[in-house]
Amino acid sequence: MAAGKPFILENNFENSSREPLLRLLERHDYQAITLTLTGDYRRIYERFLLRNAGPERHRGHVVNTCYPELPGQPAEAPLTYEQFVDGIRARGMDSFTANGPRIVVDTTDFAALDVPGLVQRLARCAEEILQAQRSPEK
């Protein structure tokens, strides 16, 4: 931000992240576009379980108690569907918005995503932000 360049900041943003992020955005006079990836919670939960069970998933992203796991330690049970959804809602992951436009993308079916349309929406939002920054009223 100090360089004044556009950038992408990717994270599972949640309510606890909002105030510190807003302070940074204000300090550096940035407006952020929030891109919320959501969809049918059941389908997302199923993908979550598959990803966590896969060999390519680093165990540090799966284990919430102690990593590396202690020898002989029983495997941690995966979150239930209800715990998964409650976590999303309680942490504000589906409602998080920074200080600018918010685009909600349904990722239930990846094949149905309109990627070119999404890129156009992002470009329009970015251009509107840049135009507002250049306006004499600012």
Name each model feature, range by range.
Residues C125, P136-K138:
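Charged, low-complexity intrinsically disordered regulatory/assembly segments
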Residues R18-P20, E46, D114-V115:
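Short glycine-/acidic-enriched loop or helix-start segments at secondary-structure transitions
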Residues A112, V119, C125-Q131:
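C-terminal alpha-helical "lid" subdomain
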Residues E26-R51, V105:
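Conserved phosphate-donor/acceptor-positioning beta-strand/loop module used by diverse small-molecule
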Residues M1-T38:
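Glycine-rich phosphate-binding loop used to anchor ATP phosphates in small-molecule kinases
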Residues E14-N15, Y41-R42, A112:
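Alpha-helix N-cap/helix-start and coil->helix boundary motif
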Residues G54-P116, E137:
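Small-molecule kinase domains that catalyze NTP-dependent phosphoryl transfer to phosphate-bearing small molecules
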Residues R47-N52, V119-A123:
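Short, surface-exposed amphipathic charged segments that create phosphate/polyanion-binding patches used
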